[in-house]
């Protein structure tokens, strides 16, 4: 767009520099003059008709009204599409032809005992400690009706129990098990009692 200079004599186009370095003189502009680059290009009726159709505006219709009508039409289409999606989501999908649909199984899953679940959940180190503890518990059970055993054999059994308790303690110190449950703690606490029994048997004179 041309820039004009205003003076007491009227409007002027300022001097401009040519590519070769020379200057064009300032030119006076008459009233009502429109520069060539600002003159709108002529478009025939047919060209205007094609341009309006490409823009989505019906021939002879105001562009603003056409834009509003287009927005309203797009809004209605979106609303209709959302409604169809909701209705299709409520209806169950039909199985493909030739596909046999089996009803959900009513058979209960196989039962797993609580002991088996605990063994599966426990790490190998914990299972080893529990196994040793179980063996120790069985050996610590004394039968009241049992006859008096040989002190040498009894001493041998008590020493075996001490070795089993020490195995549990070594596993705890090695970090294979962070803490013991109540039963395991009770078994470890019996170490002093077993040591006392061993001491008594060792001090008892043998016949």
UniProtKB/Swiss-Prot annotation:
UniProt-listed InterPro entries: PYM1, WIBG_mago-bd, WIBG_N_sf
Compartments where found: Cytoplasm; Nucleus
Biased composition (Basic and acidic residues): 68-90
Broad class of where this protein is predominantly found: cytoplasm
This protein's UniProt keywords: Coiled coil, Cytoplasm, Nucleus
Transmembrane segments: none
Disordered as annotated region, ranges: 1-28, 52-133
Record keyword Cytoplasm present: yes
Presence of the UniProt keyword Coiled coil in the record: yes
Gene Ontology molecular function, alphabetical: exon-exon junction complex binding; RNA binding
Stretches with biased composition (Polar residues): 123-133
Expression (tissue specificity): Expression detected in the ovary. In the oocyte expressed in the germarium, nurse cell and follicle cell.
Pfam families xref list: Mago-bind
Subunit: Interacts (via N-terminus) with mago and tsu/RBM8A; the interaction is direct.
Full protein name: Partner of Y14 and mago
Organism: Drosophila melanogaster (Fruit fly)
The organism's taxonomic lineage, starting at the top: Eukaryota, Metazoa, Ecdysozoa, Arthropoda, Hexapoda
The gene coding this protein: Pym
């Amino acid at each position: 767009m041309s820039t004009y200079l205003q003076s007491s004599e009227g409007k002027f186009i300022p001097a401009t520099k040519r590519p070769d370095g020379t200057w064009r003189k300032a030119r006076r502009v008459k009233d009502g003059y429109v520069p060539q680059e600002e003159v709108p290009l002529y478009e025939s009726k047919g060209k205007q008709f094609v341009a309006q159709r490409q823009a989505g505006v019906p021939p002879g219709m105001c562009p603003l009204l056409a834009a509003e009508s287009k927005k309203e039409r797009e809004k209605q289409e979106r609303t209709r599409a959302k409604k169809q999606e909701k209705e299709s989501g409520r209806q169950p999908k039909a199985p493909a032809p030739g596909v046999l649909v089996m009803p959900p199984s009513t058979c209960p899953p196989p039962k797993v005992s609580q002991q088996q679940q605990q063994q599966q959940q426990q790490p190998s180190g914990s299972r080893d400690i529990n196994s040793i503890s179980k063996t120790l518990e069985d050996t610590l059970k004394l039968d009241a009706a049992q006859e008096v055993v040989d002190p040498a054999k009894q001493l041998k059994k008590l020493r075996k129990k001490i070795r089993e308790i020490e195995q549990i303690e070594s596993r705890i110190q090695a970090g294979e098990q962070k803490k013991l449950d109540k039963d395991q703690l009770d078994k470890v606490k019996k170490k002093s009692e077993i040591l006392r029994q061993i001491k008594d048997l060792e001090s008892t004179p043998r016949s």
